Amino acid sequence: ANKFKNSACSLAVITVKDGQIIKKAYSLIKPPFMSFDDECIEIHGIQPKDVLHEKTFDQLWNAIYENHLKGNIMVAHNAKFDMNVLRATLDYYKIPWPELDYACTVKLSRAVWPDLVNHKLNTMAAYIGVEFKHHYALDDAETCAKVVLEAAKLKGVNSLPDLLKATGVPLEPFIDDKNRSAQDALHKEPEPEQMSFF
């Protein structure tokens, strides 16, 4: 919605199993503060009135995690950005970070199709023949999944771990040593002498 990373106003998740898309989830999100930057509205087309009566992220998270993310590898295009948005939003609602791994389809696209003019999601969609509405979260997520499936087909592998191994693209932890201490501090119970009473 705005420049703050915890201001996501929509989310989408696509679940892939055995090379097939088996589940989809999409929702608008009411962000913590109803402040929308014009530049952001121009990108995704979502306005404050669209999310006024939608659920907040914390009301959606458990279902998304249990039904789509738990036990799976997350994949996103320019994943570092999406992971930072997810971390910031989890932090805002004081939700512990999940123990998950993720991979980036920008890195994957560069490894599999190095000669393309660029590896933006709309470029990849056009290259693999997928029509989609850019910056509409569900289409973005589905296109991302199809990039992975096309790359796996090209490399002759049947799983994401095998694809990453074949291309040298890293599988990255959502919680690494660098950010684990900050996450632990956020959720640590205060010692008795640190407690304040009002």
Mark where each language-model region is.
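Conserved non-catalytic scaffold segment of RNase H-like nuclease domains
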Residues: A1-E99, P114, H119-H135
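Ser/Thr-centric signal marking residues that sit
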Residues: S27, T105, C144
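Acidic active-site catalytic centers that drive phospho-/nucleotidyl reactions
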Residues: N78, D82, C104, D140
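Buried hydrophobic packing segments
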Residues: L86, L108, C144-V148
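Conserved beta-strand -> loop -> alpha-helix junction used to position metal-binding or nucleic-acid-contacting
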Residues: P96-S109
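Acidic, divalent-metal-coordinating active-site segment for phosphoryl/phosphodiester hydrolysis
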Residues: A137-A151
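Acidic two-metal-ion nuclease catalytic site recognized across multiple nuclease folds
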Residues: L149-F198
